[in-house]
């Protein structure tokens, strides 16, 4: 995990916006201890200098790639700084569309030789967007506080899984099947963080409060037709789910250097 001025880094873009000239110190902790989650193996703590420059800056990144279909990404970052006040934000949008073709051949040698050939042509279309706004104020070298809010939205995540399968027994046709399944998903998420990092005499104060809430809405549909020497069968399965989640937590750490 990486912490910048006592606040946990939530996006790689936060690190990209840091200039080496603005970094006061970097501390790597290989044994984080009880103040961090048990699964955290190492912690990087970055302290920045009090901002000197003022003004507005921005960065825009556009990327595209092709894998049977075209996909696009667009990201805009901005930053405004005046005195010890720093305002930053990110707008991100992506549209991904693609195809994955797969072939699976399986042989089983039991009393008879069974062979299963499966052909799958997966298609997907996803669209998602992110908006982030953060405000930080560095009062002096010993006191800084701020707030960060992020909104994530996936209005469309559609997946199609058509698959055709043929089963043979000793090279004679035994069963054929065709299955078509679809999944449609939408999700919305919110993240809010408040932090304060300071030092009063010999005491170090580290406070963080986090809130995360959102939902996922998903529909699944599958239709399978089987033709076999033992008889034909057709099965249709549909399902709908909506999951809501929320988490709120706060942490206050007071540290004092022992004498000696």
List where the protein language model places each region.
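Face-selective signature of the C-terminal outer-membrane beta-barrel domain
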Residues: 130-154, 180-260
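N-terminal periplasmic accessory domains that precede
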Residues: 12-13, 28, 38-61, 74
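Short acidic/polar hinge/loop motifs at secondary-structure boundaries
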Residues: 7-33
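Transmembrane beta-barrel wall of Gram-negative outer-membrane proteins
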Residues: 69-101, 112-160, 187-198
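Extracellular loop and loop/strand-boundary signature of outer-membrane beta-barrel proteins
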Residues: 61-63, 116-121, 175-182, 233-240
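Outer-membrane beta-barrel translocator domains and adjoining extracellular loop/strand segments
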Residues: 100-112, 158-174, 218-231
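Membrane-embedded beta-strand positions of outer-membrane beta-barrel proteins
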Residues: 58-62, 89-91, 147-149, 207-209
């Amino acid at each position: 995990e990486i912490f910048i001025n006592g606040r946990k880094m939530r996006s790689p873009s936060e690190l990209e916006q840091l200039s080496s000239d603005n970094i006061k110190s970097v501390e790597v902790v290989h044994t984080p201890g009880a103040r961090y989650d048990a699964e955290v193996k190492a912690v990087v703590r970055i302290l920045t200098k009090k901002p000197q420059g003022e003004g507005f800056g921005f960065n825009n990144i556009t990327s595209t790639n092709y894998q049977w279909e075209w996909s696009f990404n667009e990201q805009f970052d901005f930053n405004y700084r005046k005195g010890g006040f720093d305002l930053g934000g990110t707008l991100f949008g992506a549209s991904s569309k693609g195809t994955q073709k797969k072939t699976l051949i399986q042989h089983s040698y039991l009393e008879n030789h069974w062979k299963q050939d499966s052909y799958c042509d997966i298609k997907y279309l996803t669209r998602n967007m992110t908006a982030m706004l953060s405000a930080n104020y560095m009062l002096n070298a010993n006191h800084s506080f701020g707030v960060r809010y992020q909104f994530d939205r996936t209005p469309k995540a559609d997946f199609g899984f058509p698959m055709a399968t043929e089963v043979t027994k000793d090279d004679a046709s035994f069963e054929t099947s065709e299955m078509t399944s679809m999944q449609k998903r939408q999700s919305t998420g919110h993240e809010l963080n408040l932090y304060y990092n300071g030092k009063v005499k010999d005491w170090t104060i580290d406070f963080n409060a986090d809130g995360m809430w959102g939902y996922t809405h998903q529909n699944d549909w599958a239709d399978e037709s089987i033709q076999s020497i033992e008889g034909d069968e057709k099965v249709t399965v549909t399902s709908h789910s909506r999951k809501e989640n929320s988490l709120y937590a706060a942490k206050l750490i007071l540290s004092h250097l022992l004498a000696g």
